[in-house]
């Protein structure tokens, strides 16, 4: 248990940041899932629209430190490759 006032404040800040990070990570998962569902259904237009929305969300999460930059790049790359196969 935190004893000093600064430690108590730090605990509150950590809880706030954790909630923000959890929300951002959840948003990323939602956007990625929407792309994957559109790819699975074979709807090219919906998949492209979902991908355009998901890519900046992934990169924003990487910028904010929620996920690693390489992880975000890998996810974007793999989704783009699957979208390219669908388009071909």
Curated annotation (Swiss-Prot):
Keywords: Ribonucleoprotein, Ribosomal protein, RNA-binding, rRNA-binding. Residues 1-23 are annotated as: Disordered. One of its GO terms (molecular function) is structural constituent of ribosome. It holds the Pfam family Ribosomal_S20p. One of its GO terms (cellular component) is small ribosomal subunit. SUPFAM superfamilies: Ribosomal protein S20 (SSF46992). InterPro entries: Ribosomal_bS20 (IPR002583), Ribosomal_bS20_sf (IPR036510). One of its GO terms (biological process) is translation. Binds directly to 16S ribosomal RNA. Belongs to the bacterial ribosomal protein bS20 family. PANTHER family: 30S RIBOSOMAL PROTEIN S20, SMALL RIBOSOMAL SUBUNIT PROTEIN BS20C. This is Small ribosomal subunit protein bS20. It comes from Mesorhizobium japonicum (strain LMG 29417 / CECT 9101 / MAFF 303099). The lineage of its organism: Bacteria, Pseudomonadati, Pseudomonadota, Alphaproteobacteria, Hyphomicrobiales.
